[in-house]
């Protein structure tokens, strides 16, 4: 992957105060990779700037406050995340990764944003670098921060990314049970894979789908009243866990 070429952005990283940096980067479409950009809602609303960077796909990480500005022209994935330490982002990692990879299979370019391009959206970009290039959190974070100097996931997001890295690189020593379910009421279209502590038959709900992961096997359980979409997404998540 190419290193960021935005010399002005990199210079801003070194000399500006926090407030001045926020103001500067608010209008910057920060290049992370040739086909991956990171920025704010200001950039997300600038059709000409998105066109200049050949953006075809938009990952909106702040649907609670940022609309889909060009839904008839660009392909959107919208997440209704709040920038709070207790917000669970780990359960949607694989759906986010699928969005990235679907766009790249069609030779697309992805723009990722939240309100300011600081915490929510940068966390998703860091996740992608960790996954795609097999990086630890700190290395991926520094890569993104070199391109966008205001990059700063909140401590909750940071810890979840570190924990995910540990989970996918260390051997499975005990059974993990994941529930496949809508992420949240405001965002029923986003299907999440949430770790549950109820490992065993007593923890299974007939309205849901569950994936059990052992040291060497994956099992899919579909409840009698589970929606087809949950079952389909469960199979997608199993494919991810097998990689």
Mark where each language-model region is:
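Long, proline-/serine-/threonine-rich intrinsically disordered regulatory regions
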Residues: 1-11
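Intrinsically disordered, low-complexity linker and terminal regions at domain boundaries
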Residues: 241-243
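Short, small-residue alpha-helix embedded
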Residues: 121-131
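Cysteine-based protein phosphatase catalytic domain of the PTP/DSP
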Residues: 14-112, 116, 131-160, 168-170, ...
């Amino acid at each position: 992957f190419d290193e960021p070429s935005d010399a002005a952005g990199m210079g801003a990283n070194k000399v500006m105060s926090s407030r001045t940096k926020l103001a500067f980067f608010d209008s910057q479409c920060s290049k992370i990779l040739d086909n991956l950009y990171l920025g704010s809602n200001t950039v997300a609303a600038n059709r000409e700037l998105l066109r200049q960077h050949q953006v075809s796909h938009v990952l909106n990480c702040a649907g609670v406050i940022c609309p889909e500005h060009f839904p008839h022209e660009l392909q959107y994935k919208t997440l209704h995340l709040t920038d709070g330490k207790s917000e669970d982002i780990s359960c949607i990692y694989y759906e986010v990764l699928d969005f990235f990879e679907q766009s790249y299979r069609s030779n697309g370019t992805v723009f990722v944003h939240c309100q300011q391009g600081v915490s929510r959206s940068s966390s998703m970009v860091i996740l992608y670098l960790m996954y795609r290039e097999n990086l630890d959190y700190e290395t991926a974070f520094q890569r993104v921060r070199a391109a966008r100097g205001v990059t700063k996931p909140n401590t909750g997001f940071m810890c979840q990314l570190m924990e995910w890295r540990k989970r996918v690189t260390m051997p499975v020593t005990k059974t993990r049970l994941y529930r496949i379910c809508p992420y949240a009421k405001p965002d029923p279209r986003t299907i999440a894979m949430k770790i549950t502590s109820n490992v065993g038959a007593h923890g299974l709900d007939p309205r849901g789908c569950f994936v059990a992961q052992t040291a060497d096997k994956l099992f899919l359980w579909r409840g009698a009243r589970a929606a087809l979409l949950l079952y389909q997404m469960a199979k997608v998540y199993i494919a991810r866990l097998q990689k």
